Amino acid sequence: MTGGQVKVFGKAIQTLSRVSDELWLDPSEKGLALRSVNSCHSTYGYVLFSSVFFQHYQWSPSATITDSDIPLNLNCKLAIKSILPIFRCLNYLERSIEKCTMVARSDRCRVVIQFFGRHGIKRTHNVYFQDCQPLKILFEKSLCANILMIKPRLLAEAIALLTSNQEEVTFSVTPENFCLKSSSGESLDLTSSVYSEMSFGPEEFDFFQVGLDTEITFCFKELKGILTFSEVMHAPIAIYFDFPGKPVVLSVEDMLLEASFILATLLDYPSRTSSPQSLRLSQARRSDPTLSGAQEGKSRVSQTPESISRAAPKRLFPKDPPDSSSAAETRRASASQDDISEVPESVVSDMEEGQSPSPLRKFSCMFFGAVSCEQQEHANHPLGSLAVASDSEQDASG
């Protein structure tokens, strides 16, 4: 690698250091992949440098399976604190380094990194690794309902409005608008906190596709890291997401490399105006004039300062207009049904009286599908996850 390539490679390591204290070097025939995943499995980072990114790239399998001759890749698990100081001063390396070589020695379990500078100066670093299989995530980002592509400089200017101690950021999208705002958490205290919000029109994006009006909240630290990396690459950043609780993907693609960050989003069930089941049900009712006519006969529940209730679902073809007493009975009966799309929040609040309050805002672990107990009781179709929950997590969530 030359000095400019060392800067890009080092910036990728710095970006992945925001995710975890461990880094995997995963060489293959396609190129060199850098992987990182945090301890709670809520953030996954992946950067693939193609073979043409390097001036010279040579790969050979560490071993082969005798029966089928399947090559086995060399998996190098490094401590981020051992490799990060080597690529800390990137501007200095870009100016002073003429060539950089990296050689992985499977027999000695170490990676040898050499810098060749001016005036014959040579620096050698021996980084020992552990042969460990990296975690690989299969997530089809192209199937997401919302796909946005924007220049990193424009998004970086927007997040500059957020405070430095901000931990989470919220994206809110509609077909006419994109809104970036600081997450207010459980409550917004205007006397002791700063709330920032910025809106963009579709014309500000290179690509703007919104198939689902939604609002997602995720960690702010990883967003800043991939924005810095995309600015170095001078490539637009693509954002793929659906609804709260499903992962959001931040991706940067170039002819020489591909970078993707998969982040878990905050599952805020009470604040969601419509679940995916209710969206599909509403679309089916709009397509059927008979069902849409029956929808107009549904009664509405009065709103009080203590609790705001949604309309309780009833039969699609009511014979008589329900009175107030039948509406109350329907609300009580709807709590025991399993095939409804929504549950009135007043019923949930009545069921939770006398119990200790538990936070409903929770990050959904995208690998083990950890969701709140309230959603498991009232949602007919739980959010999709990339792997089945373990037995210990099922006992804890129950």
Swiss-Prot record:
Give the sites modified to Phosphoserine: 349, 358
Give the residues annotated as coiled coil.
Answer: none
- Which Cys-Cys disulphide bridges does the record give? none
- Enumerate the InterPro entries for this protein: DNA_clamp_sf, Rad9, Rad9/Ddc1
Q: Where is the composition biased (Low complexity)?
A: 324-336
Does the entry feature the keyword Phosphoprotein, yes or no?
yes
GO cellular component terms listed in the entry, alphabetical order: checkpoint clamp complex; nucleus
Q: List all Polar residues biased stretches.
A: 272-281
Q: Which residue stretches belong to region Disordered?
A: 272-359
Question: Which of UniProt's keywords are assigned here?
Answer: Phosphoprotein
What GO biological process terms does the UniProt entry carry, in alphabetical order? cellular response to ionizing radiation; DNA repair; DNA replication checkpoint signaling; mitotic intra-S DNA damage checkpoint signaling
Spell out the subunit comment: Interacts with HUS1, HUS1B, RAD1, RAD9A and RAD17.
The Swiss-Prot or TrEMBL record describes its family as follows: Belongs to the rad9 family.
Protein name, entry field: Cell cycle checkpoint control protein RAD9B
What's the source species for this entry? Rattus norvegicus (Rat)
Q: List the gene name.
A: Rad9b
